[in-house]
Amino acid sequence: MAQFEWVHAAWLALAIVLEIVANVFLKFSDGFRRKIFGLLSLAAVLAAFSALSQAVKGIDLSVVYALWGGFGIAATLAAGWILFGQRLNRKGWIGLVLLLAGMIMVKLA
């Protein structure tokens, strides 16, 4: 694997942002009834995976995937709260904390 460079972290950050955008567009698509948002969601997912493919050139796949998934979930929760008024219950918060702890453990392993 190539030596870590910040450009790979930037690709990972872009992949995370695009995943969040895809999830928000998916919500706006209302089950693909609003086709433009559904298509935008699909385009964002494709772009996210393209960015992810660049990130794994300089960061281990296991680390990239854990960070992408974890930050994507956490940020999507935040977007759901801000944009749609969705809230987590106690079990949801515990799950989020466990998710973040798992991401840290994968990074430190």
Swiss-Prot record:
<comment type="similarity">
    <text>Belongs to the drug/metabolite transporter (DMT) superfamily. Small multidrug resistance (SMR) (TC 2.A.7.1) family. MdtI subfamily.</text>
</comment>
<dbReference type="Pfam" id="PF00893">
    <property type="entry name" value="Multi_Drug_Res"/>
</dbReference>
<feature type="transmembrane region" description="Helical">
    <location>
        <begin position="36"/>
        <end position="56"/>
    </location>
</feature>
<keyword id="KW-0813">Transport</keyword>
<keyword id="KW-1133">Transmembrane helix</keyword>
<dbReference type="GO" id="GO:0015199">
    <property type="term" value="F:amino-acid betaine transmembrane transporter activity"/>
</dbReference>
<dbReference type="GO" id="GO:0031460">
    <property type="term" value="P:glycine betaine transport"/>
</dbReference>
<keyword id="KW-0812">Transmembrane</keyword>
<comment type="function">
    <text>Catalyzes the excretion of spermidine.</text>
</comment>
<dbReference type="GO" id="GO:0015220">
    <property type="term" value="F:choline transmembrane transporter activity"/>
</dbReference>
<comment type="subunit">
    <text>Forms a complex with MdtJ.</text>
</comment>
<feature type="transmembrane region" description="Helical">
    <location>
        <begin position="64"/>
        <end position="84"/>
    </location>
</feature>
<feature type="topological domain" description="Periplasmic">
    <location>
        <position position="109"/>
    </location>
</feature>
<feature type="transmembrane region" description="Helical">
    <location>
        <begin position="88"/>
        <end position="108"/>
    </location>
</feature>
<feature type="topological domain" description="Periplasmic">
    <location>
        <begin position="1"/>
        <end position="5"/>
    </location>
</feature>
<keyword id="KW-0472">Membrane</keyword>
<feature type="transmembrane region" description="Helical">
    <location>
        <begin position="6"/>
        <end position="26"/>
    </location>
</feature>
<feature type="topological domain" description="Cytoplasmic">
    <location>
        <begin position="27"/>
        <end position="35"/>
    </location>
</feature>
<keyword id="KW-1003">Cell membrane</keyword>
<feature type="topological domain" description="Cytoplasmic">
    <location>
        <begin position="85"/>
        <end position="87"/>
    </location>
</feature>
<dbReference type="GO" id="GO:0015297">
    <property type="term" value="F:antiporter activity"/>
</dbReference>
<dbReference type="InterPro" id="IPR000390">
    <property type="entry name" value="Small_drug/metabolite_transptr"/>
</dbReference>
<dbReference type="GO" id="GO:0015606">
    <property type="term" value="F:spermidine transmembrane transporter activity"/>
</dbReference>
<dbReference type="InterPro" id="IPR023737">
    <property type="entry name" value="Spermidine_export_MdtI"/>
</dbReference>
<keyword id="KW-0997">Cell inner membrane</keyword>
<feature type="topological domain" description="Periplasmic">
    <location>
        <begin position="57"/>
        <end position="63"/>
    </location>
</feature>
<dbReference type="GO" id="GO:0005886">
    <property type="term" value="C:plasma membrane"/>
</dbReference>
<dbReference type="InterPro" id="IPR045324">
    <property type="entry name" value="Small_multidrug_res"/>
</dbReference>
<protein>
    <recommendedName>
        <fullName>Spermidine export protein MdtI</fullName>
    </recommendedName>
</protein>
